[in-house]
Amino acid sequence: MEQILTVIPAIDIKDGRAVRLRQGRRDQVTDYGDPVERAHEFERAGATWLHVVDLDAAFGVGSNWKIVESIVREIDMKIEVSGGVRDDASLERAFTSGSHRVTIGTAAIENPSWIAKILNRDAGKVIVALDIRDGRIATRGWTEETIPYSEAIRRLDGEGCLRYMVTDISKDGTLTGPNLELLEAVSAVTSSSVIASGGVATLEDIASIRELVPQGIESVVVGKALYEGAFTISEAIEVAERS
């Protein structure tokens, strides 16, 4: 089987700036400049997808929606929008902005009846974020731990979820390598597609995740490694698409 992995650069926005957090902690922030310019850089480098996160909305402390809208409007890439999508109004705003997919985290766990309705209507455009710490789902900007991820997947699979984004919180923003065991474990309990996120530090990490494509891993979100110059997006794409 040909193993082609999609590489998705990430732009996390806080207080109007492109930033990276370490393990989701708001007190460990690195500023990487203008998010719109960062998006243009990824576009020029050949990325076809972009993952955009409004961190302030995710934490419930504000909004960077005007910047998100600017990115969606100006950038000729497919956009995944994430952060603070928890009800009909915020979901509709994300869809009408022109984004191709919307990532839902907290509400998918805390509001089962709502996410079931959304998946019944728009499953192809929805990603459910499984942000995992010690085997359990963390919500509300990763500040509250809830149910085991396997329990969440059983319910969400039954409701028609087609795509999950799996993040090992302990790896996110650390450049210590992805949790391949977790990715394999999640893939083993669902037939839905999985997007890997968190910890990617080297091109070898990209190659390792590419080996999991036959198990259901379809793409990988990369953030800090790109900002810190560990490799370029074009180099990552070349490795990911190597047969």
Question: What are the roles of these predicted feature ranges?
Answer:
Residues 6-10, 49, 76-80, 100-103, ...:
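Structural preference for beta-strand elements that scaffold enzyme active sites
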Residues 114-121, 210-243:
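C-terminal helical cap(s) of enzyme catalytic domains, especially alpha/beta-barrels
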Residues 24-43:
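Short catalytic helix/loop segments, enriched in acidic residues and glycine
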Residues 12, 42, 50, 94, ...:
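Conserved, mostly hydrophobic/aromatic
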Residues 44, 48-97:
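N-terminal active-site wall of soluble small-molecule enzyme domains
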Residues 15-27, 92, 99-172:
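Conserved anion-binding
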Residues 75, 79-101, 181-216, 236:
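Catalytic cores of alpha/beta
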Residues 62-69, 112, 142-151, 176-185:
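Charged helix-capping and loop-helix junction motifs
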